[in-house]
Amino acid sequence: MSDKSEEPAVRPVTDVTFADDVLAAGRPVLVDFHAEWCGPCHTLAPALEQIAEENAGRIDVVKLDVDKNPEITTQFGIRGLPTLLLFKAGEVVASQVGLLPKARLKAWLAEAV
């Protein structure tokens, strides 16, 4: 059983925390740009949770609500949802727009990392 006080596998980030949580991270970070109203984003969420758990300690997985965080959304030119950006050493090294099945998402991530 999981302890409810544990941090979720996919942590939220904001315009304020993005630089520390993503750009200055010591390992690769997968950012899920999503919105509450986005159906495909909700469909993708369980796969991202599993990927975060499977890669704990190797890759951080975070999510950013585009409606609540317009600064970062604009900075990275996010237009379609869901959008996934993979960062290494503060730089975008891979991107994916749209919903992918979990197997394809895992393959994309493995190739990008």
Name these PLM-found stretches:
Residues M1-L30, A35-D60, K68-Q75, R79-T83, ...:
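Proteins that catalyze or organize thiol-disulfide redox chemistry
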Residues K63:
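Conserved residues in the N-terminal Rossmann fold of short-chain dehydrogenase/reductase
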